[in-house]
Curated annotation (Swiss-Prot):
A Pfam family matched in the record: RNA_pol_Rpb2_7
Plastid among keywords: no
Organism: Mus musculus
Lineage of the organism: Eukaryota, Metazoa, Chordata, Craniata, Vertebrata
Enzyme Commission number, as recorded: 2.7.7.6
Protein name: DNA-directed RNA polymerase III subunit RPC2
Zinc finger (C4-type): 1080-1095
Length: 1133
């Protein structure tokens, strides 16, 4: 007791016995959060914002089209809206369409974009409503989608899976995802050093009208402004003078009056002096001479150089800082701040980190589509203007009606092409990106879900730079630390963590007003001197200077109180930067943020009472935000906060509490049980393999006709689950089976991670899978009124039965469901006309069109069964026939399996059950795994999973293996002992071969195993004779073309090294492309059938065997006027 008293001496007994306040059920906030935000909601929210808000802004910015030909004519957009997805049945008859129908019929799931316009026709003014101008592909589960707000029963009627995440598009029947794109944030000053170590600052400005980049460079201690519209760098002082700050003293005051700042800025002032520039006019003239001449189209009054320079400064340099009526005050201060930052960075080498995640913005589908739509809409309008300019001046009967000239396909095709190819090349925004969209991978439910949270950074994969690839501390909680691919894309492709939310743009008007009320002073009212006082902080809003504040701490705390009370949007963040003396307020889109519980007076604001109300359904997540119990923090604001991971680590400085620590992992890493007991790269491997595991795709998987679909015949829930598994509904659509594993060495076939499988388990369906492939064909109509036909099967003349190739065809020429189909058998006996174009005048064409056979045949080494045949029509009104082919495969030697800990292995041996070892309760293992896989891999999580699984089976309950928590090993082992098993999880095992007990106890229990998509049947390839290439007469290459295996240059060198010359001859010529060739001994050229065309004789012609490729090379060289001659000599001389 005395020792205790010394330790807790200062505390009273009452304080000692008071319980630490813990919120037991606080993880219940997660499902509530995931209902409203997170995972796929990012894409959906962003798309909704685009089609409900952003598209109207784009229309407002380009609302009027006028023509130079007729000043009276105009076209004005009054409103624009996106409708509901539909499909045109016949001319002008539409009906609503479901996503599943678009998938089956290879159509685009899109909705009409309609506008209300007002325009002139002749002298009258006309208003037209609901005029379609194109079609917009619709994201599934967005506000305009058919599936929004439906019950599970209605989902079933629409053939959709209620667990399907949505957030993707269906374009031409293919599911496409727009990946999240990572960008450096716009409108922020970034100070960095170049390769030589010179410090400079750069700003990428971006507004709705213009995008440009401005650089501040230092050369020989002088400061210059660099911009691509200027032909050379311009001294910074001249820029200040051109903006109207003519006195040197005021310039220095703006930049800073400290000694070292003034010393650093001195040379720049002298340079301006040398250039003899003192007034604003002189400065503007100097800049005007340095402007790059743009080719001006069309007339228009020529601007003087001074006007041109002033325009340039106002609108192009630092575009995002607004200039009203040439009042350059704000822009001057911004430029001064840039100079000051560079000077300070030179002094103490504090350059910004480009990889810091607060400097990054993520672009979502909505932002990318809005850029694309803006580009297409402007093109559409300029096309209209062009037509108006052409048509109005012409004399004709009817008046010019612009509606007749609106081409709908322009916007439609632009959207569809961009999404289906993934190429966003918009000249207008200097944007050229490939691979923005990807096909949604439907290998398993997890691969589809994991694709929704993927972030792609626009960085060349080829450069081996470690900076952008490494794990940044600022990514904590925002990005998953484990889920990134291995290889060249490592660290460039990232995934969001479980609770991350990406913000969308917000109106900044209210924030500006509020800041003014909280004591932010306008910059225009201050002299330069006041800006560099030590207690004056600059206030930035989204990169623009808002004003200055004397008491920044009060501003920040009041601002946060207002946000918690719900007066400001919950996603606005405010943070201070003490080194640069700034307060940053951000309300722009693309910032990463996540929710935290607020801590007041060392107690979390959320209590157990709140959690009970949540469980009973009185509260939802929004209520927690409004009552200031939970708030969102972004990366920059996290730096000002002190966040505790658990309740018992809260101290007096703590401001927030983490909701659940396991949410800093993403979707794929969340499936791993006990990941905190594994070596880090193992979790990364599992993240990649979990996406390749076969299982279930969705409740509608039997109705889908995909190009390739792998399904497990009997998937099971994992015995050891995690909180994440429940949150993302993995146990409703699992991918894997609980296998009983014995960790022991058995035979020599389990070396290097190979597994030994039990034949009896395979017979009972362990690891059995279905492989579905599809074959499809379209029957088109051609321009000359001919069309494709399907012919009936061809009958054998003698037996009056169909020939073998047509055995499985029905009378209509299409294969019948349920039939077994072998290689080279015909699935659809289609024939097409020989002439499909309209014939030329005067050419004789047979009256009756002639047909040639183009059958759709089955290609595959193993037989398949026809599951079903679908006949429909696609968007072009061509007939569409889709067949689904099925194979059932049982595991065989060489198939790949993996546990959930990155322990992959192939099946090395299949043993009959009577030879397998068994434990004393008579259980035989399904899998025997070699124990050498554990020590070097350090996957302790797998050992614990086996224990927890075993205890769970005996107890009849599921154990949790959640990251940083989960069931304790001690408790699990005590459960085992209670049921009469060994505390260590080891069993007494009898050998199946000798019937004697094994000399060691064997670690024995259930582990969740995944069957991966890599199967031997799809990879095995060998050939003796087979097809050859036409040009070189060598065997073709590749498994699909039944090609040969190439003996390359290195293999050739090896054989030369061994001196095996006959083997070389046999491999490189005789077995490849031997060719008899005639050579003339006199001139050394190739002859033909015993005659030399050059010597005009057959006296000296001999016959040789050389590779055909060699003969081809000689002839190709001859065609280039290089003549290789073959010298012949007698063999025996």
């Amino acid at each position: 007791m005395d020792v205790l008293a010394e330790e807790f001496g200062s505390l009273t007994p009452e304080q000692l016995t008071a319980p630490i306040p813990t919120v037991e059920e606080k993880w219940r906030l997660l499902p509530a959060f995931l209902k409203v935000k997170g995972l796929v909601k990012q894409h959906i929210d962003s798309f909704n914002y685009f089609i409900n808000v952003e598209i109207k802004k784009i229309m407002k910015a380009n609302e009027k089209v006028t023509s130079d030909a007729d000043p009276m004519w105009y076209l004005k957009y009054l409103n624009i809206y996106v409708g509901l997805p539909d499909v045109e049945e016949s001319f002008n008859v539409t009906r609503p369409v479901s996503p599943h129908e678009c998938r089956l019929r290879d159509m685009t799931y899109s909705a009409p974009i309609t506008v209300d316009i007002e325009y002139t026709r002749g002298s009258q003014r006309i208003i037209r409503n609901a005029l379609p101008i194109g079609r917009m592909p619709i994201m599934l589960r967005s506000s305009n989608c058919v599936l929004t707000g439906k019950t599970p029963a209605e989902f079933a009627k629409l053939n959709e899976c209620p667990l399907d995440p949505g957030g993707y598009f269906i374009v031409k029947g293919v599911e496409k995802v727009i990946l999240i794109q990572e960008q450096l944030s716009k409108n922020r000053i970034i100070v960095e050093a170049d390769r030589k170590g010179a410090v400079g600052a750069s700003v990428t400005s971006s507004t709705h009208e213009k995008k440009s980049r401005t650089n501040m460079a230092v050369k020989q201690g002088r400061f210059y402004l660099r911009h691509n519209t200027l032909s050379e760098d311009i001294p910074i002082v001249i820029i200040f003078k051109a903006m109207g700050v003519e006195s040197d003293q005021e310039i220095v005051q703006m930049i800073g009056t400290e000694e070292h700042v003034m010393a650093a800025f001195g040379p720049s002032l002298e340079e301006c002096q040398k250039a003899q520039i003192f007034t604003q006019m002189q400065a503007l003239k100097y800049i005007g001479n340095k402007v790059r001449r743009q080719r001006m189209w069309g007339g228009g009054p020529k601007k003087t150089k001074i006007e041109e320079a002033r325009e340039l400064l106002a609108s192009t340099i630092l575009t995002h800082v607004p200039v009203k009526e040439f009042n350059f005050r704000a822009k001057c201060i911004y430029t001064a701040v840039m100079v000051r930052r560079v000077i300070l960075a030179q002094g103490d080498n504090k350059v910004d980190d480009r990889d810091y995640y607060g400097n990054k913005r993520l672009e979502l589908a909505g932002q990318l589509l809005s850029l694309l739509f803006e580009d297409l809409f402007k093109k559409f309008n300029s096309e209209m203007k062009k037509i108006a300019d052409q048509v109005i001046p012409k004399q004709r009967a009817a008046q010019f009606d612009v509606v007749k000239h609106m081409r709908q396909d322009q916007i439609t095709n632009g959207m569809v092409n961009a999404i289906s190819t993934g190429n966003w090349s918009l000249k207008r925004f200097k944007m050229d990106r490939q691979g923005v969209t990807q096909v949604l991978s439907r290998l398993s439910y997890i691969s589809a879900l994991g694709m929704m949270t993927r972030i792609s950074s626009q960085f060349e994969k080829t450069r081996k730079v470690s900076g952008p690839r490494s794990l940044q501390p600022s990514q904590w909680g925002m990005l998953c630390p484990s889920d990134t691919p291995e290889g060249e894309a490592c660290g460039l492709v990232k995934n969001l963590a479980l609770m991350t939310h990406i913000t969308t743009d917000m109106e900044d008007g209210p924030i500006i007003k509020l800041a003014g009320n909280l004591g932010v002073e306008d910059v225009n009212l201050l002299c330069g001197e006041e800006l560099s006082y030590p207690n004056v902080f600059l206030v930035f809003l989204n990169g623009n200077i808002l004003g200055v504040i004397r008491d920044h701490k009060k501003l920040v705390s009041t601002f946060r109180l207002m946000r918690r009370a719900g007066y400001i949007n919950e996603f606005v963040s405010i943070s201070t930067n003490l080194t640069d003396r700034c307060v940053y307020i951000s309300s722009d889109g693309g910032r990463l943020c996540r929710p935290y519980i607020i801590v007041k007076k060392q107690k979390p604001a959320v209590t157990n009472k709140h959690m009970e109300e949540l469980a009973q359904g009185y509260r939802n997540f929004e209520d927690f935000l409004h009552e200031s119990l939970v708030e969102y923090l972004d990366v920059n604001e996290e730096n000002d906060c002190n966040i505790a991971l658990y309740e018992h680590t809260i101290n007096k400085d703590t401001t927030h509490l983490e909701i659940e620590p396991f949410t800093l992992l993403g979707v794929c890493a969340g499936l791993i049980p006990y990941p905190h007991h594994n070596q880090s790269p193992r979790n990364t491997y599992q993240c990649a393999m979990g996406k390749q595991a076969m299982g279930t795709i969705g409740y509608n998987q039997r109705n889908r006709i995909d190009t390739l679909m792998y399904l497990l015949a009997y998937p099971q829930k994992p015995m050891v689950k995690t909180k994440t598994i429940e949150l993302i509904d993995f146990e409703k659509l699992p991918a894997g089976q609980n296998a009983t594993v014995a960790v022991m060495s058995y035979s020599g076939y389990d070396i290097e991670d190979a597994l030994v499988l039990n034949k009896a388990s395979l017979d009972r369906g362990f690891g059995r899978c279905l492989v579905y492939k599809n074959a499809k064909c379209t029957l088109k109509r051609y321009t000359n009124q001919t069309f494709d036909k399907v012919m009936g099967p061809m009958l054998d003349a003698a037996t009056r039965k169909p020939i073998w190739r047509h055995e499985i065809l029905d009378a209509d020429g299409i294969c019948s469901p349920g039939e077994k189909v072998e290689n080279k058998q015909v699935l659809v006996n289609k024939s097409m006309p020989t002439v499909t174009q309209i014939p030329l005048e005067g050419s004789n064409v047979p009256q009756q069109p002639q047909y040639k056979d183009v059958p759709i045949t089955y290609k595959g080494a193993t037989d398949s069964y026809i599951e079903k045949v679908m006949i429909s029509s696609n968007a072009e009104d061509a007939f569409l026939i889709k067949m689904l082919l099925r194979q059932t495969r049982r595991p065989e030697i060489g198939d790949k399996f993996s546990s959930r800990h990155g322990q992959k292995g192939v099946c090395g041996l299949i043993v009959p059950q009577e030879d397998m070892p068994f434990c004393d309760s008579g259980i035989c293992p399904d899998i025997i795994m070699n124990p050498h896989g554990f020590p070097s891999r350090m996957t302790v999580g797998k050992l614990i999973e086996l224990l927890a699984g075993k205890a769970g089976v005996l107890d009849g309950r599921f154990h949790y293996g959640t990251a940083f928590g989960g069931s304790k090993v001690k408790d699990v082992c005590e459960d085992l002992v209670r049921h009469g098993y060994n505390y260590l999880g080891k069993d007494y095992v009898t050998s199946g071969i000798t019937g004697e007990p094994l000399e060691a106890y064997i670690y024995f229990g259930p582990v969740y195993y995944q069957k991966l998509k890599h199967m031997v049947l799809d990879k095995m390839h060998a050939r003796a004779r087979g097809p050859r290439a036409v040009l070189t007469r060598q065997p073709t290459e590749g498994r699909s073309r039944d090609g040969g295996l190439r003996l390359g240059e290195m293999e050739r060198d090896c054989l030369i090294g061994y001196g095996a010359s006959m083997l070389l001859l046999e491999r490189l010529m005789i077995s490849s492309d031997a060719f008899e060739v005639d050579v003339c001994g006199q001139c050394g050229l190739l002859g033909y059938s015993g005659w030399c065309h050059y010597c005009k004789s057959s006296c000296h012609v001999s016959s040789l065997r050389i590779p055909y490729a060699c003969k081809l090379l000689f002839q190709e060289l001859q065609s280039m006027n290089i003549i290789p001659r073959l010298k012949l000599a007698k063999y025996n001389e």
